[in-house]
Amino acid sequence: MTAKRIPATVRLEAILAEVENNGHASVSDIAERLGVSEMTIRRDMDKLGAEGHVVRTHGGAHSNDDLRSKASEMIEPSVENRATRNRSEKKRIAASAVRLIEPRSTVAIDVGTTCFELASLISDSTVHIVCASLPIQRVLAKNQMQIYAPCGRIAGADPSTVGAQTVAYLRDFRFEIAFLAVAGITEDGLFDYSFEDAEIKKTLAMQAHSRVLMLDSSKVGKSSAVRVMGFDSIDVLITDAPLPPEMAAVLADLNVDVVLAP
């Protein structure tokens, strides 16, 4: 029987759809379904494998879950997703962090859901708080706190001010303590989703006497698009579970104090 002439785009889409739906695609099954030769489908799968869309196996291909997982780490989750994810752990971390704030101190608070939980707990009206996050500014204003709001361009699904004006404003401050949050950490350091957010975090760290990273354990071992800084730029890490031994050793060598939130 002569094999049909099926456009390459149709064949490739059929393979990807099978992998997406079932996790695996068989050369013989796809060839039979489309009425083309197995050699043609093998070449198509080789192409998809070389491009990283699938993992080539003997007789077929399966989904590249590792690639999909890595790609998802580069994309910032929605505000709604982050607000509900590991919320109890974030509350515990925030409860430990708020104890570090001294009366009449000047404090910097980064953006993010853990930082929001921290801001919700601050009740000392003698504390001066600098924060670029609009949602955090609102919760602080509701609690009648002393807030300094940087100028700049508003950006992000979790809106905050960013850009050169924001950085210049922050550089005029000296903070007793800065509370930072990132998308993830590996042994190579701290990572986040965008260059603009990373620049704000670097500035807060540079202007602070003490730098506290608040991070729930789901972010340990996760990288993202932009490396923000190394562990030598923080003094305290507050998390909710013990770190992997290798990472704990790196932090110990740098004299970073690791606090497990009760």
Model-identified regions with their sequence ranges:
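Glycine-rich N-terminal segment of FAD-binding domains in flavoprotein oxidoreductases
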Residues: V107, V111-T113
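HTH-adjacent hinge/linker in prokaryotic transcriptional regulators
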Residues: T2-L34, M39, R43-V107, A119-D124, ...
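Short glycine/serine/threonine-rich phosphate/pyrophosphate-binding segments
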Residues: T114-L118, V220-S223
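A residue-level structural signature of the nucleotidyltransferase/glycosyltransferase Rossmann-like core
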Residues: H128-I129, I177
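Conserved phosphate- and dinucleotide-binding cores of soluble alpha/beta proteins
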Residues: T2-S28, G35-E38, A50, R56, ...
